[in-house]
């Protein structure tokens, strides 16, 4: 499976993943809104928005 793995508004990059899901985490801090993308569907702390999906590059 292919997931996007670029940070925030960086140009799109992808990585091959062993599992069948991708994630997109979104949160805000003193730098503004931060977006992190990658493989799997991790546990997140309170205050972090998590979206998990199950198709190639679905987390862009």
UniProtKB/Swiss-Prot annotation:
InterPro entries reported for this sequence: Snake_3FTx, Snake_toxin-like_sf, Snake_toxin_con_site, Toxin_cobra-type
A GO term for molecular function: acetylcholine receptor inhibitor activity
Subcellular location: Secreted
Main localization category: secreted
Record-linked PROSITE patterns: SNAKE_TOXIN
The UniProt record lists the keyword NAD: no
Tissue-specificity statement: Expressed by the venom gland.
One of the Pfam families matching this protein, by short name: Toxin_cobra-type
Disulfide bonds: 3-22, 17-39, 41-52, 53-58
GO cellular component, one term: extracellular region
Keywords in alphabetical order: Acetylcholine receptor inhibiting toxin, Disulfide bond, Ion channel impairing toxin, Neurotoxin, Postsynaptic neurotoxin, Secreted, Toxin
Keyword Cytoplasm: no
Residues spanning the membrane: none
Free-text function comment from the UniProt entry: Binds to muscle nicotinic acetylcholine receptor (nAChR) and inhibit acetylcholine from binding to the receptor, thereby impairing neuromuscular transmission.
Protein name per UniProt: Toxin aagardi
Organism placement in taxonomy: Eukaryota, Metazoa, Chordata, Craniata, Vertebrata
